[in-house]
Structure formats: structure tokens, C-alpha cells
Amino acid sequence: MIIKEAKDAKRGRVHSRIRKKMEGTPERPRLNVYRSTNHLYVQVIDDSKGATLVAANTLEFGEAKEGKRPTGGNLSAAKQLGKAIAERAKQKGINKVVFDRGGYLYHGRIKALADAAREGGLEF
């Protein structure tokens, strides 16, 4: 069984390899995804300026149970997040992005987020 530290270290190595080849420009900024245990965080980043242009996370959309933080680690929250990031990017005049999956497999929540962002009008 692979322990969590080993999995995370492997993902970090994959992500650094991907980042060497990928760069967000003002014309096509980078759509970066971070997946925690309970939430997803998405940013549209212009790497030439080193600035975050648009950001969203599932903390904004999850349903909170009594006395607890909202949950956002599921497919429905990922779909809502994809639509929200696409809408916010379009408001800033961003239509095309480069998708940076952050070393995560293109499966599950990451795939749902990407598909929803495409449905929302982002091209990648």
C-alpha cells in the first residue's frame, strides 16, 4: 500500500514536470487546480505577471451542515465550481485557457470540473 506522503510526493514530481512545459500567457492564462481532501480550489493565472486573474473554490458552494463547514469534495460541487470559474473568467474577458490539472489524474472531480468549465464557455 502506498502511503499518503509517497502519493503526494509523486504528484508533486509530476506537477513540476508539467509546469516546466506549460506557461500561462496574457492571451491564454493557466487554469490551475488544487484538490484537497474536502475541497477544490481553482485559479486562472497569468504566469508572465505572476498574478491570479480569477479564483474560486468549493467552500463557496457546498452545503453546510449544522455547526460544520460546507462540504465540497464531490462531483456536484466540482461541476458548480467549473461553471463558476468559467463565468468569472468570461466577465474578465478570458475565453481561452491552458488547463493545468496539477499532477492529478484526469478523472472524477478533476474531469467534472474541466467538463463544466468547457460547458461554461472556456476553451482548452
Curated annotation (Swiss-Prot):
Gene Ontology terms: cellular component: cytosolic large ribosomal subunit
Superkingdom as given in the UniProt entry: Bacteria
Keywords linked to the UniProt accession: Ribonucleoprotein, Ribosomal protein, RNA-binding, rRNA-binding
Gene Ontology process terms (BP): translation
SUPFAM superfamilies: Translational machinery components (SSF53137)
GO MF: 5S rRNA binding; structural constituent of ribosome
Family per record: Belongs to the universal ribosomal protein uL18 family.
Stated role: This is one of the proteins that bind and probably mediate the attachment of the 5S RNA into the large ribosomal subunit, where it forms part of the central protuberance.
PANTHER family associated with the record: 39S RIBOSOMAL PROTEIN L18, MITOCHONDRIAL, LARGE RIBOSOMAL SUBUNIT PROTEIN UL18M
HAMAP family named in the record: Ribosomal_uL18_B
Quaternary organization: Part of the 50S ribosomal subunit; part of the 5S rRNA/L5/L18/L25 subcomplex. Contacts the 5S and 23S rRNAs.
UniProt-recorded name of the protein: Large ribosomal subunit protein uL18
Organism: Koribacter versatilis (strain Ellin345)
Gene name per UniProt: rplR
